[in-house]
From Swiss-Prot:
Keywords annotated in UniProt: Aminoacyl-tRNA synthetase, ATP-binding, Cytoplasm, Ligase, Nucleotide-binding, Protein biosynthesis, RNA-binding
Gene3D superfamilies found in the cross-reference section: HUPs, RNA-binding S4 domain, Tyrosyl-Transfer RNA Synthetase
The encoding gene: tyrS
Gene Ontology CC annotation, any one: cytosol
Family statement drawn from the similarity comment of this UniProt entry: Belongs to the class-I aminoacyl-tRNA synthetase family. TyrS type 2 subfamily.
GO molecular function list: ATP binding; RNA binding; tyrosine-tRNA ligase activity
Official protein name in the record: Tyrosine--tRNA ligase
Binding locations of ATP: 229
Compartmental location: Cytoplasm
SUPFAM superfamilies: Alpha-L RNA-binding motif, Nucleotidylyl transferase
S4 RNA-binding domain: residues covered: 336-397
Amino acid sequence: MIVQDSVCSELMRGCEEILPVPELEKKLQKGIPLKIKAGFDPTAPDLHLGHTVLLNKLRQFQQFGHEVIFLIGDFTAMIGDPTGKNVTRMPLSQETVLENAKTYQHQVFKILDPDKTTVAFNSQWLNKFNAVDLIRLAATHTVARMLERDDFNKRYTTGQPIAIHEFLYPLLQGYDSVALKADVELGGTDQKFNLLMGRELQKHYGFEPQVVMMTPLIEGLDGVKKMSKSLDNYIGINETSEQMFGKIMSVSDELMWRYIDLLSFKTGKEIQQLKQSVLEGKNPRDVKIDFAKEIVARFHDQTQAEFAHNKFIERFQKGNIPEDLEELSLVIAEPIALAQLLKQIDLTASTSESIRMVKQGAVKVDGDKISDPSLKLPIGKSYIIQVGKRRIAKLSIQQAH
């Protein structure tokens, strides 16, 4: 069976980098189910939409008849992935890892087809490693090769400690591909070193090397930094339908297209048609509403998507002030610029975001749109402050004594 070029194009769409492309095309042209691997270390209990960029790609492979292996790195999670870290990461307990792993499985099957997914745990083979096995694995690579990794290199050159077990992490992750005989491995762009390690180790052990497909790291709600729970710029897949809908509606039109490209189940052709319709006069807000409904329906259901949409209209588009409005208090010695104030009460992540939101006309005080980020609100009064479509609070500004 010859795989159509359109199938190859659809599978490659949205990937940041594929190494190497000709090998992927060759594997797909064989017309037999490939083993598609993606590993997740359950270091936190909840997934967010940033994680689903990769899960969506796995789902595509399932739709085209390939075998998806959802690998839970229960063994490697106890080491801790050093990728992007400037300090040694503290290992997690086995109990925490297993509890998080249970939550992961429940969440991923909101996207993946459980009947077409093999769930594996790398403790199945790594727990069997003895000292000889580990030394032989470590002997496949040099310290110089490990220091090619940007994060290791930075820590080494600045005198920050690197624990020996951190060097073992990419080797163990790479060995997972050997154990599973993976044909393709998916991961984020930040995982490039680890993904290529799997390819190198497969060659070393005499297997056909896997193709590496890297998906982009999606920006968070601020449109600047990658989506992360620690930065509070994320959309969790376990959030309520109203929270999810509101957060999606809060993103800029520019970021909306980025989200649609990476998160929608629409084909590339359908997305191009959407973009063309906006160029021809369709309101981007309507596209955003449809996208928000799609995402909410995926993680809840269509009824909840319609409910969230109606609540959103009732709360924001009709100008209603919600009954459960968050009440904030700020005590200051003298009035401060609105841009600084918004950051101080956590309605924005930074002063620069405050300025950007004001300039976009996304900030209202008592229902009036504000155009001056340096505006100073008088002390001794209360205000209804709204930033974007979802962040709204009642603020009381009091005089410091």
